[in-house]
Every structure is written in structure tokens, then in C-alpha cells.
Amino acid sequence: MGKPAAERRLSENEAQAFARLIRSSPRKLNLVAQLIRGKAAGEALALLTFSKRRVAGEVKKVLQSAIANAENNHQLDVDRLYVSHATVGRALVMKRFHARARGRGARVEKWFSNLTVVVRERADEPVQEAAE
């Protein structure tokens, strides 16, 4: 009994990972996501490791999860992976109150974001660098 398995939304040479409710605004998170779009997986991990932005650690965890999904669930070659999509979306916005002068209050919005990273296996063979 039970319902049939859903069809795979991605192609056979892709894997993805999600992060929900990242405590950063979508605008700031998208700056980090732009760094890794189209880059090889190893190069993207190196960029995120040495990035000064706080949210780069969260993006790195999602990218590592996507790489692990590709390797373990879809049997893709890790050396041929690259970041095909890195999309950022809005999540909830917490509204808070900040006390101001003369008994007034100001609204403080604390933005949350969602992140989706899709890695794809390149069709061509990885380039072997000449060893000296």
C-alpha cells in the first residue's frame, strides 16, 4: 500500500541540498551564493572556507551536503562536480521592537533566508595538470 514514488525532478547527473531558515537576509546571502555559481566544487569550497562573510559557513555546509548527496545517493564523480545553481529565497521575517526616544518605538525586521544548491557532473573528463 502507499503512494508511488515521485519522479526525480533533477536530471541523472545532478544532486541538490537545501537549507531552511538561515539567519541572514536574502540580499546578504545572495552575495555569497554569487561567489560559487558556476565554479568547480573544490574551488567553491576553498572560496567559502576563506571568505570573511559570516554566512559563508552556512553556505559551505549546504555545498558539502550537496556534494555528499551526489557521491552517496547518485554515484556521481566528485572530481567532476560543479555548482550549477545556487538560489536564495525569502523565508520568514521576525518583527521586533526597538525602544526610541520620547516613548516611541521603531520596528526591527530580522530576515531569514532559504538556500538551494544544485551540483552537476561535467560531461567532459577532468583536466589533468602536468606534473613537473
UniProtKB/Swiss-Prot annotation:
InterPro entries the record matches: Ribosomal_uL22 (IPR001063), Ribosomal_uL22_bac/chlpt-type (IPR005727), Ribosomal_uL22_bac/org-type (IPR047867), Ribosomal_uL22_CS (IPR018260), Ribosomal_uL22_sf (IPR036394)
PROSITE patterns in alphabetical order: RIBOSOMAL_L22
Pfam families (UniProt xref): Ribosomal_L22
GO CC entries: cytosolic large ribosomal subunit
Keyword Ribonucleoprotein included in the entry's annotation: yes
BP-aspect Gene Ontology terms: translation
Any one Gene Ontology molecular-function term assigned to this protein's record: rRNA binding
Gene3D superfamilies: Ribosomal protein L22/L17
UniProt keyword annotations, A-Z: Ribonucleoprotein, Ribosomal protein, RNA-binding, rRNA-binding
Keyword set includes Heme: no
SUPFAM superfamilies: Ribosomal protein L22 (SSF54843)
Family: Belongs to the universal ribosomal protein uL22 family.
Subunit comment: Part of the 50S ribosomal subunit.
NCBIfam families: rplV_bact
Purpose of the protein: This protein binds specifically to 23S rRNA; its binding is stimulated by other ribosomal proteins, e.g. L4, L17, and L20. It is important during the early stages of 50S assembly. It makes multiple contacts with different domains of the 23S rRNA in the assembled 50S subunit and ribosome. The globular domain of the protein is located near the polypeptide exit tunnel on the outside of the subunit, while an extended beta-hairpin is found that lines the wall of the exit tunnel in the center of the 70S ribosome.
Name of the protein described by the UniProt record: Large ribosomal subunit protein uL22
Organism of derivation: Rhodospirillum centenum (strain ATCC 51521 / SW)
Upper lineage: Bacteria, Pseudomonadati, Pseudomonadota, Alphaproteobacteria, Rhodospirillales
